[in-house]
């Protein structure tokens, strides 16, 4: 992971490389702390309340880090203010992570449970509220829908952050929704073949 940081630093202009990579490393450190917490949960078979679960897994899903890396690598003339904004785990990024994390947990719940991984948000909801898997999934789908509404509102109303950056955050959520829409396309990537083929072979013209 930090080897990748070195590659990014070497690829960036020297006048911004150190500052920008330091910014990314700070976020990666938070991700690694979350990984340690998840290992403890798994080894102790701990099923946290939903809020505690999301406080960690919204970070470890790595989408905040991906947005940070994309900002530094692909966005030109990134200001200090924008970097500081991104470092706060802003609402639109958090909502993007909610979409990604919860959709993954819903569609991959059985697979993750069978391999004794960290409890999914579905399992956490079932334990905390005494719900069935179906009831928990329905509640979490509503959370995903609300996250989409909040992301769209933030995109339309935010004027101090470049629209190109905001839409990149939303596009990541769109990609994850495609990957986890009723299927676990990450675990079984072959099922995404037709969708990828359509994108590459029959793209929609604008």
Outline where the language-model segments fall.
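Alpha-helical, largely C-terminal catalytic domains
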Residues: 1-206
């Amino acid at each position: 992971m930090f080897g990748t940081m070195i590659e990014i630093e070497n690829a960036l202009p020297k006048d911004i490389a150190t500052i920008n990579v330091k910014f990314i490393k700070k976020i990666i450190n938070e991700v690694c702390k979350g990984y340690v917490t998840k290992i403890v949960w798994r080894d102790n078979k701990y099923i946290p309340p939903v809020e505690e679960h999301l406080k960690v897994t919204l970070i470890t899903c790595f989408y905040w880090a991906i947005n940070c890396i994309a900002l530094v690598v692909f966005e030109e003339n990134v200001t200090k203010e924008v970097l500081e904004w991104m470092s706060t785990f802003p609402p639109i990024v958090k909502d993007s992570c909610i979409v990604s994390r919860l959709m993954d947990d819903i569609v991959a719940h059985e697979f993750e449970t069978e391999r004794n991984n960290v409890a999914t948000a579905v399992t956490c909801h079932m334990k905390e509220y005494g719900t069935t898997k179906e009831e928990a999934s329905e509640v979490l789908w509503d959370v995903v829908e609300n996250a989409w509404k909040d992301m769209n509102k933030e995109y339309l109303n935010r004027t101090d952050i470049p629209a190109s950056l905001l839409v990149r955050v939303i596009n990541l959520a769109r990609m994850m929704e495609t990957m986890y829409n009723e299927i676990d396309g990450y675990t079984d990537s072959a099922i995404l073949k037709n969708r990828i083929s359509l994108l590459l072979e029959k793209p929609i013209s604008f």
